[in-house]
């Protein structure tokens, strides 16, 4: 999260090969310095690459799955867990919207707010620390903008770290 505090520095943490390809191409075209953080457990990830599609620009999240009951917001490797969680919830007749942030700076506040205002519930998945983290910022955005509609408190789930 400390990288997000550096003025003018863009930060990308893509989960999908197509996003990594297009975000890297966008980074080459802009004047802002950009940091790409690739999760090593995503290196063997395969997927369709559409070279003709320009892809979404920095600061635009990708809604991987539309839903109406809960918004699951994440980035990088945890997107895989978000998608699995949505599949499990679907078996329980719970419709989860999955949002892949793709870039953490600029952060797509509008997509987060719009989704949570629609679903009225939010789960933020991350591998980071519990405090002073990206999920802390996302939770803050949700509370500042959606507190009147929330049916339950926002849940932050942090993947256990191995150290």
Where are these regions (language model features)?
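Conserved thiamine diphosphate
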Residues: 1-30
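Charged, amphipathic alpha-helical interaction segments
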Residues: 25, 32, 87-91
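Thiamine diphosphate
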Residues: 40-163
